[in-house]
């Protein structure tokens, strides 16, 4: 990359392709994270449209100011994306220092995620129409999201050969393609077995656990729609997403005394500080194991 090239001369797609390669191959970031970072950087490049060698903190601040209609949390995410991008520019020799180091991140209030009560979780499970194999799939999806605390990308990416139901666990591919073993309780396991037994014979060799009516992997958007549709059927008016089940999973475990570091391992968090957000519900002493304390593992 030449330092004296303008963004309008150095096609945005070329920059993004090179940056995309860096994120995937050198930073080992997940596909979703790479897509998010590149989306933010693309918006910035179109806003900046000048000599990259002259990039400074004022340009970063101006771009963030132009996005003032978005939340502080989104601004913080964008700044993180740009900081990573500028680190790459330093590595490439385009700029000497990272201008984002001089930009203060937006002050964020303590984020308390929305959670479902145990009773609301049960209402959603009961609201699923299991008269077809697709209904059995939806029930199994909800049970796995809540029973294992998976991210939606982890759930729709779950492969049949990653199920070890006799051993009571599943193998999950998380962020950065990092693997972890996650215990699975009886209700989620039974729902999976019931669903897999009902899948059409023509899809018996399908690679992914959760598939659509054509036998291909269920998309993230389809999973979102399934959760929202089921919430409406259950009469729940909260803003519900697949991630709500993950929040509820963690909160209910900690409420019932599960050890914070066990929950951290289950969620696949790099740092226990990320998991500590769930301690806002209950300050009681944490003890025993996840299996003992999840409300749907009894």
What does each model-identified segment do?
Residues 1-298:
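Conserved catalytic core of the tyrosine transesterase superfamily
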């Amino acid at each position: 990359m030449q330092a004296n090239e303008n963004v309008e001369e150095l096609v945005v797609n070329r920059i993004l392709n090179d940056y995309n390669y860096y994120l995937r191959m050198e930073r080992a970031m997940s596909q979703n994270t790479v897509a998010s970072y590149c989306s933010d950087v693309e918006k910035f490049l179109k806003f900046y449209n000048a000599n990259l060698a002259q990039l400074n903190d004022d340009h970063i601040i101006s771009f963030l100011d132009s996005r003032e209609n978005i939340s502080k949390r989104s601004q913080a995410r964008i700044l993180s994306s740009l900081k990573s991008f500028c680190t790459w520019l330093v590595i490439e020799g385009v700029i000497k220092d990272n201008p984002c180091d001089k930009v203060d991140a937006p002050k964020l209030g303590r984020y308390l995620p929305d959670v479902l009560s145990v009773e609301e979780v049960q209402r959603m499970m009961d609201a699923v129409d299991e008269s077809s194999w697709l209904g059995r799939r939806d029930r199994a999806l909800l049970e796995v999201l809540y029973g294992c605390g998976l991210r939606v990308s982890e759930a729709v990416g779950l492969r049949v050969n990653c199920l070890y139901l006799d051993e009571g666990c599943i193998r999950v591919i998380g962020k950065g393609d990092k693997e972890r073993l996650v215990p699975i309780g009886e209700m989620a396991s039974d729902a999976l077995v019931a669903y897999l037994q009902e899948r059409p014979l023509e899809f018996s060799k399908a690679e992914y656990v959760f598939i659509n009516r054509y036998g291909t992997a269920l998309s993230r958007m389809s999973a979102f729609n399934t959760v929202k549709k089921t919430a409406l059927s259950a009469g729940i008016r909260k803003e519900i997403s697949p991630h709500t089940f993950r929040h509820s999973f963690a909160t209910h475990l900690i409420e019932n005394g599960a050890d914070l570091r066990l929950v951290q391992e289950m969620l696949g968090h790099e740092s226990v500080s990320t998991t500590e957000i769930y301690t806002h519900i209950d300050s009681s002493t944490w003890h025993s194991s996840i299996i003992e304390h999840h409300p749907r593992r009894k």
